[in-house]
Amino acid sequence: MRRSIVIVIALTAKGFLHRHLLEKGNLVTALSLRICNSRAFSGRSDYRERLRSGLHSIKFNDALTLFCDMAESHPLPSIVDFSRLLIAIAKLNKYEAVISLFRHLEMLGISHDLYSFTTLIDCFCRCARLSLALSCLGKMMKLGFEPSIVTFGSLVNGFCHVNRFYEAMSLVDQIVGLGYEPNVVIYNTIIDSLCEKGQVNTALDVLKHMKKMGIRPDVVTYNSLITRLFHSGTWGVSARILSDMMRMGISPDVITFSALIDVYGKEGQLLEAKKQYNEMIQRSVNPNIVTYNSLINGLCIHGLLDEAKKVLNVLVSKGFFPNAVTYNTLINGYCKAKRVDDGMKILCVMSRDGVDGDTFTYNTLYQGYCQAGKFSAAEKVLGRMVSCGVHPDMYTFNILLDGLCDHGKIGKALVRLEDLQKSKTVVGIITYNIIIKGLCKADKVEDAWYLFCSLALKGVSPDVITYITMMIGLRRKRLWREAHELYRKMQKEDGLMPIK
């Protein structure tokens, strides 16, 4: 009876999987074959010893070399040994490589077992190749293998990965009809994927269905729902879900508490955030770096920078290492509070602790100095950014242009814009909006109008901000008719609606 699920698949996709594996040989397969062919038989290491010592920390290139050693061995290793290696490669997120290496195994005449089929199906699903995953399922069942709930779990995950949630639920119903019992992991996969896509109401329906089927939700189930509901502002529903969780005797974990602290902090309910922190300590739930980062972020958002610094000291005293998120949050907080020099001190601490700054780090400091009109200090930040191997992006240049325009240095801003254009950098509408606004602010409305009219020649379409900025400039010059005509053009020709 269970085989009925793949009769259609097996008939319609007959040979599809085999053709794919023959036709889609890629660089990884070529590389592995080249290594195999170039190595002398006597130089091989004993693959058995490597397998015995464990594969949890193996690197990709070493895994390929080990695969070649195994493929050259006489007699050939079993599919069980190959599966152990290929599962380790899959854990490195090298799914395409695993698919290619399975093709090589088939060429060597090594037959699949249940676990190798399940691994291959999982890799197809993670590469969003569901038709091949289903073909593989059909092939394995045709050969007499009974898929496990893990196999079906991979397929459900594959459907969710490409947002085919209805088919994921339909597959779960078919699994039940075939006598399998879906576990909480399968339902968690669907609920979490729905929450990630903002389809929380559907996720709540799945939760109801899950309970109806007698599957007990766990803390992972509730964490997905609570996190999404809180972040979407549906406090009433999220509180109800949290109560439901507690009523079922499911204890909140570090993820639950961190999510609550994060939301309360962002909403300015700092006392409640601290209350949640104290409660997790009382419940012997150990905070992690995400918990502390959430606390620091909430304090920084609301300008309590000294308290945020104290939390940083606490996490260090408890043996945690601040990461880029920790430091970036503090730097951003200081810059928002116009304490950019203090932000620079955090960057120095960050560098001392061996944590590399990223584009966000440097752009935040760069923007802080530009907004304060300290362009000399801003240039030093830019120099440090480049010397550390972090490349400025378009946002970096926009920060400079915006700062120059805000401080009445429109001439320098225009020179920088010209330099950008000469460097063949693609300049977008955001950059032109900054310059148009700067020209209007400097009472150079005619120049702004000329730039506005030349946008089409530059291959750039104006957006609502462009129109509104230009209309404000025209109205300041009391050019009412021109402003009104521009408003009509915005609505009729470009189909843009004004911002309320």
From Swiss-Prot:
PROSITE patterns per record: PPR (PS51375)
Gene3D superfamilies the record matches: Tetratricopeptide repeat domain
Family, as annotated: Belongs to the PPR family. P subfamily.
Any one of the GO BP annotations: defense response to bacterium
Keyword Disulfide bond annotated: no
Protein name: Pentatricopeptide repeat-containing protein At1g06580
NCBIfam families, alphabetized: PPR (TIGR00756)
Keywords for this protein: Repeat
InterPro entries: Pentatricopeptide_rpt, TPR-like_helical_dom_sf
PPR repeats: 78-112, 113-147, 148-182, 183-217, 218-252, 253-287, 288-322, 323-357, 358-392, 393-427, 428-462, 463-498
Pfam families documented for this protein: PPR_1 (PF12854), PPR_2 (PF13041)
Originating species: Arabidopsis thaliana
